[in-house]
Amino acid sequence: MSPVYVNLLGSVGLLAFWYFSYRWIQRKRLEDPLPPWLRKKKACALTRRSRHRLRRQHGVIDGENSETERSVDLVAALLAEAGEESVTEDTEREDTEEEREDEEEENEARTPEVNPIDAEGLSGLAREACEALKKALRRHRFLWQRRQRARMLQHNGPQQSHHAAVFCRVHGLRGFQVSVWLLLTLLWSTGHGVSVRCTYHGTDVNRTSNTTSMNCHLNCTRNHTQIYNGPCLGTEARLPLNVTFNQSRRKWHSVMLKFGFQYHLEGWFPLRVLNESREINVTEVHGEVACFRNDTNVTVGQLTLNFTGHSYVLRAIAHTSPFESYVRWEETNVTDNATSSENTTTVMSTLTKYAESDYIFLQDMCPRFLKRTVKLTRNKTKHNVTVTGNNMTTLPVWTPECKGWTYWTTLSVMWRNRRSALLRAKSRALGHWALLSICTVAAGSIALLSLFCILLIGLRRDLLEDFRYICRDEGSSSTKNDVHRIV
């Protein structure tokens, strides 16, 4: 499994553990924290004290019927015979403390302290804040609707005001749903099925010892809407295809894309193949540069080249890692002719030489090209025109001294270095994700420790009360054991 998914699952598991731990602690806070045997004993003691308090309030306390007083008198008599008068004082002190605790319980019952954090934890506080916000929004909406009805009644009369109020209520109920539906529809209509295709046709191919030239005509459409029709030469200058900002940190990127458009749209690409395959006898060239979104809404770029019945296709999928895809040109319309097979081998070797650069260029260019052509189709009067001019595209034999060759070499080296950087980054990815995992675990541990400390601080009063009760119960049980031992 990929380290990305491992860390994602670990983070989700840590959040789930934190959430369920918090819920368990909140549930335990609402329960009695004492064990069952101590809880039963405490309930009995509270029952006796409550009964004693009620009898004292109604004035029906009888010394003969009071089990507590009778037991205290018996213990006092036994200890008096043994000469232990201090026990009587301790018993009286315990009675005084019980009466004081009863008074405190009565005061707390009269003025209960309501704290949402002590009662239900952070969920209670959040619930109260949410209820207060709902009340404020409901109040604001009611006042706004009343002002709207008053304004409509003042300007249009009672009947039209009734219709306007009904419309406002319907709009308030369904406006958000309609807005979301329209937004999703707009995104789907603008993002699904978009295609931009630029096809070129080269005729009168003429090759000399120093240059290769041809008459080239280009036609570009977006969803069957024409955005350019004219000679290949000067296409990049006539179409505002500045798909990147010409900033200092992106200057090399802008240069690469600019030369890439010139290379593929102005006919340099087939001329380079013809220059490096001079033994092929070709008189006509067809080609296409296409960018489209497939049925799964994934951007795909495609280069097509056709030499006298032989077609070569290169496809690139955007937003994918170059090292995870197999880059190669595919050949179609294969014949069994020996001469044709030899020519095909020569062309394939020439195309394979820079296939990686063409692939990465399509990955980078197609998403930007699709977004850029949206503006071209909106302004039809300015850019949807037929351009006339010189159709002749000439390219010298590509030697290291040629400017185009220098650009293309720099472009290929940059893309090759970019691919190497991605490969090196992939080898270091595991170390980065391991560091992220350690930081995630440490942050989760700190969060759990903080939660425990916060809950401990919030429960300090209950814990101290439980400890005092346990200590008092242990002290009374030791006194009873001493009495039984004396008896």
Swiss-Prot record:
GO biological process terms held by the UniProt record: symbiont-mediated perturbation of host apoptosis
Region (Disordered): 83-121
Glycosylation sites: 206, 210, 219, 223, 242, 246, 275, 281, 294, 297, 306, 333, 337, 343, 379, 384, 391
Effect caused by changing C44A: Complete loss of ability to translocate host RSAD2 into the mitochondria
First and last residue of the signal peptide: 1-22
Annotated keywords: Glycoprotein, Host endoplasmic reticulum, Host Golgi apparatus, Host membrane, Host mitochondrion, Host-virus interaction, Membrane, Modulation of host cell apoptosis by virus, Signal, Transmembrane, Transmembrane helix
Domain of life of the native organism: Viruses
Keyword Endoplasmic reticulum part of the UniProt annotation: no
An annotated GO cellular component: host cell mitochondrial membrane
Site residues by UniProt (Cleavage site): G193, V194
Transmembrane feature ranges: 433-459
Record's keyword annotation contains Membrane: yes
Recorded family membership: Belongs to the immediate early glycoprotein family.
Name of the protein in question: UL37 immediate early glycoprotein
Organism: Human cytomegalovirus (strain AD169)
Originating gene: UL37
